[in-house]
Amino acid sequence: MSDILTKKQDIELRRAVIQYLRYFVPEFAQDTAVNTISRLLLDADLNKFDNEIQRMIPKQYLEKKWTAVLRLHRKVEELERTIGYQSNKVEIELQSQPHSDITSNSLDRINWVPGIEPFQKLNMHNGHPVTAIDIHPFQPIMATASQDGTIVIWNLLNLTEPQQIIRNAHTRSINTIKFMNQEVMDGHSTKKNRLLLATGSSDLLIKIWDIEDSANLKALRTLTGHENIISCLCFHPTEPSKLVSCSKDKTTKVWDTRTGSIVLSFVGHSNWVRSVDINRTGEFTLTSSNDHSIRLSSLLTGTGIGLMIGHEQVVEKVKFLPMACNKYLDHIAGVKFQNELKINDDNYNKVDYKYCISGGRDNSVCIWLLPLPLIRSDGTMHPSTNPEGKLILKLTEHKSWVKDIAIHPNSRFIISVGDDRKINIWDLGLLLESNLLQPFRSISTQGFPSTLCMAKPVIKDQESDDLILLNEAMRCYLAVGHSDGTVTLWKKNIQKEYIL
């Protein structure tokens, strides 16, 4: 008898084995063979076995036991993954607590994520939906904009009252607002370098504002050329005087903000272009559209490089993912496609992009492996022989439209907001470790969140993989704008503000 099984279990197992084997013995040899097996296992003749089997063993008993064990094994594996997932959540939760005892040398800032309860709720848009938010890249200044054309400037160190409110900054909804990445010399000014803010509106205009004095915003110039609603703006990362815009007129344009002239204009979609982003070197751009697609283009020529197709509705937002995300996504992509893709192609380092993330009205957040361009000997870039991007992950926890996406400075967390009144925080590390496609944290909101912005660390290379350096430069602010005219702000209590 087995040391593991009781005597009763041991006999039951032997009976089940005989019952199972009986179906595999040819009929002409059944009496002899089964009787022999019966005597070996039970020390009983076949007739006695038949009587016992009918009385004590259900039909197909061994098969039922075996499938039950398999189901139990799968359940144990699922529970182990869940326990690992929850353990990691607790660890990150402890690091993100505002009153944690973690020492200053730890990574408590770079691992900070907003808690369930916000730090403060701001209400200066008179009930008009907040449509755009941006936090200055190195000053403690936040700009919010709303559907009635109002801009509000906030000092993050003193939120008692806004620094300035500009009513009728545009005659229609302001859909996008962006701070310049760094100071630039204005071509029409002998003054020192300027800090600029750009706004794009449904009135078809882009306005450039001087924020040298954040309490006295001044309009420098107006850029005209779009023939329909302006959806999104993005300053060039290496040539800060250049601004990229996209519009309902299906075009993507590059502007010289010093002169107001259009440097480049191209049509890459068959419908409204909703979102635009630029990679770190400024050579490539991503656009998303009402035509359900995402387009990768050369920002030098407007030439299409690749196309991502997989959303089933309007794609509201698209962003390049930092190269630091690769350590999480390479493994996921390799497992999904069984190493069919050239995940480790060194050309990704040359073009300085690899993955992107998008959110759409099909309620999903998608992560894509971007295609590489063909680079000719003259330096021109062309679509590859396989220009279609690969869908790596599709996250479907939102129950309504995904409106906006932000990437955490540590390149591990992704934050998405949706019309289901949810702010979902995704952990790429947990997605890799647990294989559970669910958010690390989900925060419910009273109003419908429509836009969000997370403060960038005050550091030259914001995609640095030096976590200690990033931790020191981290500014722990997350702002979310809502359709009820409020802005919800999360903040980690830090004694020192890191301002250049």
Curated annotation (Swiss-Prot):
Biological process according to GO: cell division; establishment of mitotic spindle orientation; microtubule sliding; mRNA splicing, via spliceosome
Compartment(s) of residence: Cytoplasm, Cytoskeleton; Cytoplasm, Cytoskeleton, Spindle pole
Example of a GO cellular component annotation carried by this entry: U4/U6 x U5 tri-snRNP complex
UniProt-listed Pfam families: WD40
Domain of life of the native organism: Eukaryota
Keyword Cell division applies: yes
MF (Gene Ontology): dynein complex binding; U4 snRNA binding; U6 snRNA binding
Keyword field: Cell cycle, Cell division, Coiled coil, Cytoplasm, Cytoskeleton, Microtubule, Mitosis, Repeat, Transport, WD repeat
Primary location group: cytoplasm
Spans of repeat WD: 125-164, 169-219, 225-265, 268-310, 338-378, 397-436, 459-500
Keyword Coiled coil applies: yes
PROSITE patterns: WD_REPEATS_1, WD_REPEATS_2, WD_REPEATS_REGION
Free-text function comment from the UniProt entry: Positively regulates the activity of the minus-end directed microtubule motor protein dynein. Plays a central role in positioning the mitotic spindle at the bud neck during cell division. Targets cytoplasmic dynein to microtubule plus ends, thereby promoting dynein-mediated microtubule sliding along the bud cortex and consequently the movement of the mitotic spindle to the bud neck.
The family this protein is said to belong to: Belongs to the WD repeat LIS1/nudF family.
Subunit structure: Self-associates. Interacts with NDL1 and dynein.
Protein name: Nuclear distribution protein PAC1
Organism from which the protein derives: Komagataella phaffii (strain GS115 / ATCC 20864)
